[in-house]
Amino acid sequence: MIEKIWFDNHFLGKLLWPLLWPLSYLFKWIATKRKSDYQSGKKQSYRSSVPVVVVGNITAGGNGKTPVVVWLVEQLQSKGYKVGVASRGYGGKAPHYPYLLTETTTPDISGDEPVLIKQRTKAEVAVAPVRSEAVKMLEQQGVDFIITDDGLQHYALQRDIEFIVIDGKRRFGNQHYIPLGPLREGVERLSSVDFLICNGGESQENEVSMRLQPSEAINLVTGERRSVSSLSNLVAFAGIGHPPRFFETLNQLKANVVHTQGFEDHKAFEPTEIEQLMQYGEQLIMTEKDAVKCQSFAQSSWWYLPVDATFPKEKAQQILNKIIEVKE
């Protein structure tokens, strides 16, 4: 319901205005003061000895940051660089922090997105509630670059390159701060970053257009790959920032979806609640982010759909050149 207020001009927004506006103003004041304290030196920030690239956004919810992080890691790896990824590890509870992921780390330890990034890229991935602590851990691994998954507003960590990922269809909603609107920072922040990435929709001036390109569906148990359109009676579910985006992708791929179910972002699934979805169809299809949480109890009729960030060739080269220049 809150997203309908933020993005769809729902009438409840007007009814709740007297309650939400003061909270929104307080959020803005705290966020602005916190940023000012770090920029003025009143609060100390950490400067890494390794170039730091921040991939974040100014709105709450999923905008497609993780595919951008994966793309950056893979591109830099292809140039021979060793890359580390720092994350807050939301949704996980590690035995200690900072925590360096291994090939066997599970989402309940580190959170779902760090596991996805580790599995896709084999990069060094570290998590800590204070991102600068994760960065320090990665420095010890001898990485050439550190990319932070989210953390644009974590001003306790200095950075060399900043990306803002924008949902090209929903944009910035009603342009109010949380909780009246989706903003973590004001739209004026857009003018101060190195790259604005527009995920879907129509990119605007000074924005780099990005598309999430789906590949074949992959079976969670066997690893078999099949085209989505060849799968029948699919039940689709997603526990991501904006589930309708996943369902729309399936529709574009002409998937035979008979039921959809959205869950909150970073949800820790119980086997029974996923198994119950099977009553609506013959097979399940989910996002890659959800698959890392369901892998341990997956059934042979469960599939996931990986997506890859794609950019115009010229823009992709500009992005890489800018990052590599920092190192040189």
From Swiss-Prot:
SUPFAM superfamilies: P-loop containing nucleoside triphosphate hydrolases. GO terms for molecular function: ATP binding; tetraacyldisaccharide 4'-kinase activity. One of its GO terms (cellular component) is plasma membrane. One of its GO terms (biological process) is lipid A biosynthetic process. It comes from the Bacteria. Belongs to the LpxK family. This is Tetraacyldisaccharide 4'-kinase. It comes from Aliivibrio fischeri (strain ATCC 700601 / ES114). The gene is lpxK.
